Design a protein with these regions (language model features):
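Non-catalytic, alpha-helical, charged scaffold/linker segments
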Residues: 156-167, 182-198
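Non-catalytic alpha/beta scaffold blocks inside enzyme catalytic domains
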Residues: 2-178
Length: 198
């Protein structure tokens, strides 16, 4: 049976490079391919602009079983803005805006390099948050540590990364290959900012 709730990369949907986000709520509602306990969404305003059918999506988000429980039991939602999806969430994790957080598009995500060179894109914060928010990636890293997930804890059980900025700089899948391989410098030891373009 499919491993993903959106059935991406199955014989039904073999061409799914970016996933099938528009299928997540309807599949969770139908318990197809399996039942889930919690739907965790990030900046995906599925109640409005990504659903292709707003009325049907809202009905699925509010539908209840005969025992009175919601068919989609728990919804956790993280966003920088109070989108339509917030109204249906049981837990809301306020996120930073793109001006307030570190972020990257790396070789491990959607490569933006060329065949003969590696390249990364980095987002560097330009303002500090003026409210009680945390970057979603940092929240996930914290959850990874709290759940003792491999790769997020040290051998001593301590957090492997303090936040997403730390993760971007230190994480490597293989020597020299991590979220910011292009920002490690010629010696492979630098991080965060590369040398000026020549």
């Amino acid at each position: 049976s499919p491993a993903r709730i959106d059935k991406a990369f199955t014989w039904e949907n073999p061409m799914s490079a970016h996933g099938l986000m528009h299928m997540v709520i309807s599949n969770a509602f139908a318990k197809d391919p399996y039942e889930i306990d919690t739907l965790f969404l990030y900046m995906a305003n599925m109640a409005w602009n990504s659903s292709m059918n707003t009325q049907s999506t809202v009905e699925m988000l509010t539908a209840k079983n005969s025992d009175g429980d919601y068919k989609i039991k728990n919804i956790i939602y993280s966003d920088s803005y109070s989108s339509e999806m917030v109204a249906y969430a049981d837990l809301i994790l306020p996120d930073t805006t793109y001006l307030e957080r570190y972020d990257c598009i790396s070789l491990l995500d959607r490569p933006i390099g060329e065949p003969d060179l590696i390249a990364d894109a980095i987002r560097w914060p330009v303002v500090k948050p003026d409210r009680d928010v945390r970057g979603f990636q940092s929240v996930l890293i914290d959850l990874g540590h709290r759940l003792s997930l491999p790769g997020f804890i040290t051998e001593e059980g301590k957090p492997a990364y303090s936040d997403y900025e730390d993760y971007m700089k230190k994480h490597e899948r293989k020597p020299g290959i991590g979220p910011l391989a292009g920002f490690r410098g010629l010696d492979g030891k630098s991080n965060g900012r590369g040398s000026p373009n020549q």
